[in-house]
Amino acid sequence: MREGMPQVAKLPRAFRKIRLELAREKGHPAGSSGYGYTLVAPLGSDQKIDADLWISHRDACRVVRFRPTGDDEVGHLIHQPGGSSGAFWLLRYDIRGEDSDEAGYRFQDEHFEIGEYVSIRESDTMHTYRVVSVEPI
């Protein structure tokens, strides 16, 4: 497992390692496996992120943002109150909160299944990523 990812010995069976890769977009007409994210998160039987399990294992809910150049950024998957659905998911790399977060657009509604698409707001731009793997931890 990559540096910065949690130890898995004590995690519930619902935890998964999820790999997202950049889908087709302007500038990347074929998508790109070099741009993406690896998430460690609990999934319910509906393949959505399980917010209740997140509460009791929040430190284990991690994200690694990878790019073709530069170091990987390691952070946390954060669930915050607010938004139109009452709560939303963020990817936070600076736990002190000095840097801006990346928002997982409608992550609470997304099914993390191979072939599905999810959107992440990076700075002021929305990017779409394809779920390419979901593995038990």
Predicted feature residues:
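Short beta-strand micro-motifs in enzyme catalytic cores
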Residues: 16-18, 89, 127
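Short amphipathic beta-strand and strand-loop transition segments with alternating hydrophobic
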Residues: 2-9, 76-81, 134
